[in-house]
């Protein structure tokens, strides 16, 4: 089902996007890191958890059994489409979806025990402001954990596509590489410390995943879901084919028995309020 994403999400304003395609493009990888994010935020029984940029609700889904029936998990996202998807996936679970800008959260100070943000912070126009909001809504002693993508070469499923597209669309280079904008662990650490967090740690974390085939990898890109595939749809048909073939050539080194297997590195930053 296609829905319209609101402005500010890493999809073009007013563009119809299939949330399930987004899950196939990014979700299959992001969920590999969610257990480490929840552990860094010490999500546990009776906890009040805020999942910022909840997307299709994967982090919230994994947090719910950790907090139990006496806890609560709120999922905030600026995208109506993503909230619709998350609400449908988690209906009846105790999940509370809220339409919200991560840079201006509609919650009282000290409302939560833990705040997590999985692959959302790098798309904030002002990520430092967002981290400041995370600190504001956390109680004293509460925990934050954010996960962002490392450098393009350490996230080849996204990095190669962004690099190839940037040669065809040089005017969009900044947009294409926005996914990697918080790749510097020192910058992420400084941001957390600057927001008032203590015991800050930023750890490089790697997971390996796979696609059944190159076609399995490529199919969500054709839907234009996410900041990088959106740009792909701007190209003429001949250029799209050229991009596809070059990306396929680059990723061939990850192919084994027809499947694409590759590692992705992300940074997990955490701290105590």
What would you call each of these model-derived segments?
Residues 113-127, 150:
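A short SAM/SAH-binding and catalytic strip from SAM-dependent methyltransferases
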Residues 16-27:
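Class I SAM-dependent methyltransferase Rossmann-like catalytic core
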Residues 48-105, 114, 129:
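Class I SAM-dependent methyltransferase SAM/SAH-binding core
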């Amino acid at each position: 089902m296609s829905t319209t994403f609101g402005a500010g999400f890493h999809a073009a304003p007013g563009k119809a996007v299939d949330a399930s395609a987004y899950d196939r493009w990014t979700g299959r990888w992001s969920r590999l890191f969610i257990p480490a994010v929840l552990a860094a935020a010490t999500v546990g029984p009776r906890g009040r958890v805020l999942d910022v940029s909840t997307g299709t609700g994967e982090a919230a889904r994994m947090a719910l059994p950790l907090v139990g029936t006496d806890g609560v998990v709120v999922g905030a996202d600026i995208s109506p489409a993503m909230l619709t998807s998350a609400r449908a996936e988690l209906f009846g679970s105790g999940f509370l979806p809220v339409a919200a800008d991560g840079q201006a959260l509609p919650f009282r100070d000290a409302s939560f025990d833990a705040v997590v943000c999985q692959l959302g912070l790098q798309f904030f126009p002002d990520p430092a402001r967002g981290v400041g909001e995370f600190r504001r809504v956390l109680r004293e002693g509460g925990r934050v954990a954010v996960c962002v993508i490392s450098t393009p070469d350490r996230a080849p499923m996204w990095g190669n596509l962004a690099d190839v597209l940037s040669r065809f669309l040089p005017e969009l280079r900044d947009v294409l590489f926005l996914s990697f904008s918080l790749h510097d662990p020192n910058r992420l650490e400084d941001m957390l410390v600057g927001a008032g967090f203590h015991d800050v740690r930023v750890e490089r974390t790697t997971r390996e995943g796979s696609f059944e085939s190159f076609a399995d990898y490529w199919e969500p890109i054709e839907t234009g879901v996410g900041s990088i595939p959106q740009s792909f749809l701007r190209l003429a048909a001949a250029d799209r084919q050229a991009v596809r073939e070059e990306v396929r050539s680059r990723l061939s080194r990850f192919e084994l028995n027809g499947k694409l297997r590759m590692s992705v590195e992300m940074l997990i930053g955490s701290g105590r309020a």
